């Protein structure tokens, strides 16, 4: 094969496999808040399986644990601290408007 006709080969970077987010000793349970809180966004939403890098079974168990913790009031359904601060600061300070008749 001639050098000019050879396909361009990319340089291969070294690849290090990331550690799984859930170790074998971790219990997926609604009471295990340190584990559950890793899989919730800042807004209080459950992160997707692709973001979490979990297996299908692990994601299903995490989702059930989060929902159970929400029902038992261990976790909020929504985390709207930023929205609450905004509505508090934009509250009207003026009195009632005078109506024109």
Curated annotation (Swiss-Prot):
GO cellular component: chloroplast; ribonucleoprotein complex; ribosome
Pfam family, one: Ribosomal_S18
GO biological process terms held by the UniProt record: translation
Superkingdom to which the source organism belongs: Eukaryota
UniProt cross-references to NCBIfam families, sorted A to Z: S18
Family indicated by similarity: Belongs to the bacterial ribosomal protein bS18 family.
InterPro entries according to UniProt: Ribosomal_bS18, Ribosomal_bS18_CS, Ribosomal_bS18_sf
Assembly and binders: Part of the 30S ribosomal subunit.
Protein name, as recorded: Small ribosomal subunit protein bS18c
PANTHER family, per database record: 30S RIBOSOMAL PROTEIN S18, SMALL RIBOSOMAL SUBUNIT PROTEIN BS18M
GO molecular function: rRNA binding; structural constituent of ribosome
Record's keyword terms, sorted: Chloroplast, Plastid, Ribonucleoprotein, Ribosomal protein, RNA-binding, rRNA-binding
Entry's localization field: Plastid, Chloroplast
Major localization class: plastid
Keyword Iron-sulfur: no
Gene3D superfamilies listed in its UniProt record: Ribosomal protein S18
Cross-referenced PROSITE patterns: RIBOSOMAL_S18 (PS00057)
């Amino acid at each position: 094969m001639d050098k000019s006709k050879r396909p361009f080969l990319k340089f291969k970077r070294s690849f290090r496999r990331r550690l799984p987010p859930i170790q074998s000793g971790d219990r997926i349970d609604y009471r295990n808040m340190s584990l559950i809180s890793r899989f919730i966004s800042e807004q209080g939403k459950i992160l997707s399986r692709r973001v979490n890098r979990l297996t299908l079974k692990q994601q299903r168990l995490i989702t059930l644990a989060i929902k159970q913790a929400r029902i038992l009031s261990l976790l909020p359904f929504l985390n709207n601290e930023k929205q609450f601060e905004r509505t508090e600061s934009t509250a009207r300070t003026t009195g009632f408007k005078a109506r024109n008749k």
